[in-house]
Amino acid sequence: MTKINPYKGILVELKDIVFTSSSDQIKLPINTFKSILCCGATAQYQCGKINRAQYYSRLARDFALSLADVTALFDTVQATIRPEESFLAFLAELKSRFGEQLKLYAVANMSREDYAMLKSLPIDWSLFDGVFLSADLGMRKPELRFFRHVLESISMKPEDTILVDNDTDNILCALSMGLKGILFGSTSVPQALTNLLEYDHISRAEQFLRSHAKSLHSVTHTGVTIRENFAQLLILEATGDIDLVELEYHPTTWNYFIGTQSSQLLLHKHNADRMTTMTSCWLVSAFLVVS
């Protein structure tokens, strides 16, 4: 039986994901820069209602800045824009792996002038099956009509589509329509996309277990590895594969820990409360399994 990828399209924000930039060298206070990016003039500029000259003049007036300061601000940031090569390579790998089964679209709240600058950068734009700019559409994310227009244009259903974006509002709007959302920065986007697109989850899980055989130990949220028999016995019960686990056998009563190093962590004041909590959670899990 042929297995079909459950998702047919990915919408990817260009700014800060496909392309990155830095505001470290700007002369204005960072809070002023953030306010500029969120102001009404920026929204009008990104929707194509005003051109760059009008936009800069509005910002100078609204924020009591000189036109030279506004121009220098954006010139400084623009000079730092770079393609995110590793992410582009990942997108190319996806396109190669899934072929025509998966479409990739760029979406951005961006002016035509800014997009023209990005187009001059050396990336393979053929990766994208289409580009949707707020300036061309006269609407921006997170407006519902923006997503409706894109989905209608590409003839896809929300449930078949993934949005990768760096703005929580955009993700929440997409989720409300039925799209799958991945918030950039909160997780590894390549890993999250792989998890969604790789349909054979059982095979992936089995591969993970085999590649980490004998090392499937409990780890605290601070990165402390706890070698103990309880988790090993749970894995053995679930999989029936003795080659996956590391057990310390005892002739009669079993020790909870494997070796002495893990048990000595209990003596460390910093870990005592955490270990007590972890032990309680494991015991509750064991009770539920047995029940």
From Swiss-Prot:
<protein>
    <recommendedName>
        <fullName>Sesquiterpene cyclase astC</fullName>
        <ecNumber>4.2.3.-</ecNumber>
    </recommendedName>
</protein>
<dbReference type="InterPro" id="IPR036412">
    <property type="entry name" value="HAD-like_sf"/>
</dbReference>
<dbReference type="GO" id="GO:0016114">
    <property type="term" value="P:terpenoid biosynthetic process"/>
</dbReference>
<comment type="pathway">
    <text>Secondary metabolite biosynthesis; terpenoid biosynthesis.</text>
</comment>
<comment type="similarity">
    <text>Belongs to the HAD-like hydrolase superfamily.</text>
</comment>
<keyword id="KW-0456">Lyase</keyword>
<dbReference type="InterPro" id="IPR023214">
    <property type="entry name" value="HAD_sf"/>
</dbReference>
<comment type="function">
    <text>Sesquiterpene cyclase; part of the gene cluster that mediates the biosynthesis of astellolides, drimane-type sesquiterpene esters that show antimicrobial, anti-inflammatory, and anti-tumor activities. The first step in astellolide biosynthesis is performed by the sesquiterpene cyclase astC that catalyzes the formation of drimanyl pyrophosphate from farnesyl pyrophosphate. Drimanyl pyrophosphate is then dephosphorylated by the sesquiterpene phosphatase astI to produce drimanyl monophosphate which is further dephosphorylated to drim-8-ene-11-ol by atsK.</text>
</comment>
<dbReference type="GO" id="GO:0016829">
    <property type="term" value="F:lyase activity"/>
</dbReference>
<dbReference type="InterPro" id="IPR023198">
    <property type="entry name" value="PGP-like_dom2"/>
</dbReference>
